[in-house]
Amino acid sequence: VIVLGLSTSTPTGSAALWGPDGLLAEERYDALELHAEQLLVGVDGLVRRAGLRPSHLGAIACDVGPGSFTGIRVAVAASEGIAAGLGVPRFGVASLEALAAAAAAGARPVIALLDAKKSEAYVGEFERGEAAGPFEHLDLAVARARAERCLARGGVAVGDVLHALLGLELPSGASILRPDAAWIARMGRSRAVSGCPTQPL
């Protein structure tokens, strides 16, 4: 199964193709200026550059946030259109979930944080790859305390607010900043091949 992943929940958007042997192709966009029609054109070019046809796609995976409402709406609209046109399933993957997966932390706890503007952050905490609770929308001071607590436990912190907004110095290797379509596609493929039911985006 080859899966198309879309992520436009942050200013840096991306699209990627993930197959049985891993990443096939990836492209990045300025999500602040992106419209669904432009994303569809970009996806068509991405598929062609990978030497594929749209009919080769077996599922679509989309970043469903939290993040930019406008950006998420663009990716969801594009994914719904592509999935409906091809008659393939679509899967939603949370932006914080993709960030945590990219940290490749193994058994260590992970906290993922994304800029929510207005001195706030979207926060998700994970234990052994699973969400430890619901995602939260927190004041930066509270988010910082959560991140420091996770790091004190030997955990990993990822996200675009860690240094610029929270002033935290990151441990070596913790450079994951934003959700990436490659991870969205990878996680979507895992759900597709395991027979997970699709859900409304």
Q: Could you describe each region identified by the protein language model?
A:
Residues 46-50, 85, 103, 184-194:
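Stable alpha-helical structural segments in soluble proteins, enriched in small hydrophobic residues
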Residues 1-66:
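N-terminal beta-alpha supersecondary unit
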Residues 61-89:
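DPxDG-like acidic metal-binding loop motif
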